[in-house]
Amino acid sequence: FTSTDRAKMFYYRGYIYFSQEKYGLAETAYKNLIAEEDSSDQERQGAIYSLSQLRYIAEDYKGSITYLLEWLDNEEEPSSDGYGLLAQAYYQVENFQKSVEAVDTAIDIQESRDIPIKVAVLDAEGNETGEMIETGETRKGVAKENHYLLKMALYSELKKDLEVLPIYEILVQYYPKKRYWTNLSGLY
């Protein structure tokens, strides 16, 4: 096997072990991948991100943060999920200010996306065919519900209770649940 072949083998082993919840074996495979000199940047980055998740699962939040910061340093377009995980890890170690910064970045990434508006295609009788077409228009992206909820929890920890009002307004618009309406009305 070449170093490149071994790197691919370690990548797939890590992936399989992770999906089978054999976290120790997955971690070993990903660390072996990183040690391979001919592993690609993409494989290395994927392994580092997976290691951050594995450290989080093991409740080693500082280890998770270390891997996530390394991943962010080398990732051209970091995902909102990466920042969301970083925010959760910072929350767990009670670094609430850094957690707010990370969750704000996650939300900004998601809200800055332009989502194409799609409509259903109708047949001659006016029934939906199951096919969707884009209208050419877009709408603003919306962050994941759990990112908004984490931000509210952080504001509570930081004693900024009134700052949750705009978050509840977003939640009732995009994730309408009775508890959000109840809490929003209580703030007014």
Kindly give the residue locations of the regions a language model identified.
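Alpha-helical solenoid scaffolds that mediate protein-protein interactions
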Residues: F1, L33-I34, W71, A106, ...
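Mid-chain, structured segments of secreted extracytoplasmic proteins
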Residues: T2-E36
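Generic helix N-cap/helix-start motif at coil->alpha-helix transitions
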Residues: S3-Y11, S40-S50, E75-L85, D114-P116, ...
